[in-house]
Amino acid sequence: MNISLEILYNLSSIFYKGKIVIKKINEKQNILNDNIGFVENWDFSKANLNEENRILAITQVASICYQNPKALGSESLYNRLMAESMGLPSSSFEFVPVLLDYENPKHQEILKLEYSNCKKFGEILDDRYLLTNYRALVYDFENDKDKFSFDIRTIFNTQEECKIIKEYFKVFLFKVDFPTRSQMVRHRISWQELSRRYVSAKRVPFEFYVSDKLKENQKVKDLIKQSEDLYFELLENGVKPQEARRVIPQMGYTQIWGAFMPKQLDNYFKLRLDEHAQWEIRQTAIAMQELLR
């Protein structure tokens, strides 16, 4: 059965063997007053419960790049992503939260290190836990296996630990215009975006955000049409999507996942809820805050 990614992302839950693995908690539509932009709040707290959950979480996030539902749960995609960046995993692995307990003997092998990627990209919770991510765990193991008495990549979290993760680790899916996206990614959190390098507008049509001040401007309307016409003309002439996409104006929409640790989320709200923030990115923060209430 063929299913579009838009339909896939509108599913409220991702199942494995009849159990809910990843769940969309709630959503805020029409954040930019054009019936296109949105923010969704997702639950990835069980992503590190077992290996199957890891694969589903990672391929769920990575599939946004390719807009291909077949990517979901694909072990071949997972294995490719594991060695995507100079033999180390892609950023989609950052969407698997890992909770390390200072009272757990196995976890202590990682936590006792003066320096580690787990610590660098993690946050201390309640003076007992380190909330980090699976990509950092893999980096630490691959960089120096001799430091550990076992394969730390096999560390999974318990159901009780997943409840703690759910309280602190927040994942959102955004649909915003390019300038808003550019402001968002200045925040050093985990991001994964739709890639127009791989996905042509023949498969996923372009959508455009036209602000209130530009809606009645005929030249803006003409620019949108001209850019789309040129894009498709380039494709017909053999130009690849990764080159043809350069003619699309900044008002184009994109989709992007974001995963926030507690301090990262606080910083995002501090800067983007401020009255001096640009209206569009402020709407993302307002929507996120409402979804978390």
What annotation goes with each model-predicted range?
Residues 2-293:
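Family-specific signature for flavin-dependent thymidylate synthase
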